[in-house]
Amino acid sequence: MAIIKLFSGSHCLKKEVVQNIIETTGYQKITDQNVVQASAKLSNMSETKLFRAFSARASVFNKFTREKETAVAYLKLALSGLLDKSEFIISGYSGLLLSRKISHAIGICLIADLKSRISNAVEQESLSKKEAYKLIRRSDGDCAAWTTLLFDVDDPWNPSLYDMVIPMDKKKPEEAANMIIQNAAKDVVRATSDSNQAVIDFRLAAEVEVALARNGHHCGVDANSGEVTLTINKPVLILNRLKEELKNIAGKVPGVSMVHTIVGKSFHQSSIYRKHDFKLPSKVLLVDDEREFIETLSERLQIRDMAAAVAFDAKSAMDVVAQD
């Protein structure tokens, strides 16, 4: 069966779904806490600083220290070290770190309408409706900041990020768990030699990313059987000098056979690439009171005789606001 990456909005019955999956399949669970603890051992960063990577709020000095980006590099490296078995569920933010090239992993999103989430929060945490709303809005802001940081997508429930989106206001936990288990057992998501190589590539890319971070650099990193491609997403005054510096650092990482550098889609923006000079976090996503979620299944998981799933309107009504 496939690796399960489960991301969820707050108060969407994630705990119950995960527990049902574990009891049914015997899967092991990897949590954000597990990944952060492993990251702390690899780096000189505290668990508090590493957990801060999952938050919409960053240190006021992050623009200069790039603490959040460095934390993400170490979180990836730590996660790669936990991938020693195929049958486990990664619950939380950490699952979104896993390379999409690992085809024997399926991404799941649990989300629900605001009314049911508020009801769950009031019941589970003895909050007022107003307190529950604020808590959910803050949590959604963290989720939006995370998907923006990783994918430049400010809607954390965007179906394009997942293989399945399950509306938990319409499903019971056991129903959702059964859907996930059934899809995780499909032949299309079984491990192959290519997908196992993708796990090795993910670790190598993480090692390169950490090596660059230690030297004050942050750029896109992709690995393919020892060949590493670095994507520069910020303009720089002397591009060739930067390319050589990045190649020199990446080339010293064990397992790297060749290094390529390319410029990304943001290269021609007006900001300038410098060490320790990174844009501030994205604004926080507001909760849309009227948003209704529908069940979606990625193309690779759709059976042959099933009609195409209705696509959710990407132009959501969510607004982005600053939390200063």
Predicted features by range, described:
Residues V35-I90, L127:
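ATP-dependent small-molecule kinase phosphotransfer cores
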Residues K129-E174, V199, R203, E209-V210, ...:
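Small-molecule kinase domains that catalyze NTP-dependent phosphoryl transfer to phosphate-bearing small molecules
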Residues D305-D313, V320:
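Short hydrophobic/Thr-rich beta-strand motif most characteristic of the beta2 strand and flanking loop
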Residues S103-E123:
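Conserved phosphate-donor/acceptor-positioning beta-strand/loop module used by diverse small-molecule
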Residues T261-K283:
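Non-catalytic signal-transmission and effector/linker regions of two-component phosphorelay proteins
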Residues V287-D288, A311:
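Conserved sequence signature across two-component system core domains
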Residues E290-I294:
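Short acidic/polar segment at the start of the alpha1 helix of CheY-like receiver
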Residues E295-I303:
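Charged docking surfaces used in two-component/phosphorelay signaling
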